[in-house]
Amino acid sequence: MLITDEMIPDSIAAMEADSKKVVVYRPRSLVVGMGCRKGVPVEELDQLLTDTFQSHGLALESIGCIATAEIKRDEPGILELADRYGVAVRCFGVDELNGMFDENGGNPPNPPLRKGGEDFVRLARDPSSAPHRLLGVWGVSEPAALLASGAVELLVAKERSARATVAVARTVFG
């Protein structure tokens, strides 16, 4: 039995080809933070998502939820994408999202959290003036992924298409 939210390694695929039975369990451990312009079709959002997961070796079957800004709660493309993957949409307000940045859109001055002997700061790393100008938030995909997952770091930092952004964090269990 293999428990993973990553793509199946070639060695496991080779075992299956040799008629050895392998059970793969996909925990719903990945949180997708997503932001987009109004009216972006589900196909465009799904392409960004699948390209991002493939380039980082992640399994789409392990998506636990899609996190976004409260203002995107009724965005058709995001709702259709969540339905396509059978997951919920979690929404966060302006104050929650901006709480991941300092008041100028930069990193907050709090001390870093300790993890594995290295310093990590629980915050989004790539503030953007575009969503701040339009929605009043410094970013959507990175802070939403961190907030929904409870993680202290992103698994995949913000990636962009022409009209959308995506970031991924792994859910903290226990």
Question: Which residues fall in each region the model found?
Answer:
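Catalytic cores of large soluble enzymes that bind and process phosphate-bearing ligands
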Residues: 41, 70-73, 131-135, 158
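Short glycine/threonine-rich loop-to-helix capping motif typified by GTGT followed
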Residues: 71-85
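Intrinsic disorder/low-complexity segments
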Residues: 104-119, 125
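A polyampholytic, Gly/Pro-enriched intrinsically disordered region
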Residues: 119-144, 155
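C-terminal edge-of-domain segments
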Residues: 4-16, 22-25, 141-174
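Exposed, flexible binding/inhibitory loops of compact, secreted disulfide-stabilized domains
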Residues: 55-56, 78-79, 125
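A conserved beta-strand->alpha-helix junction
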Residues: 88-101
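Conserved mixed alpha/beta catalytic, RNA-binding, or beta-rich assembly cores of soluble enzyme
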Residues: 1-72, 171
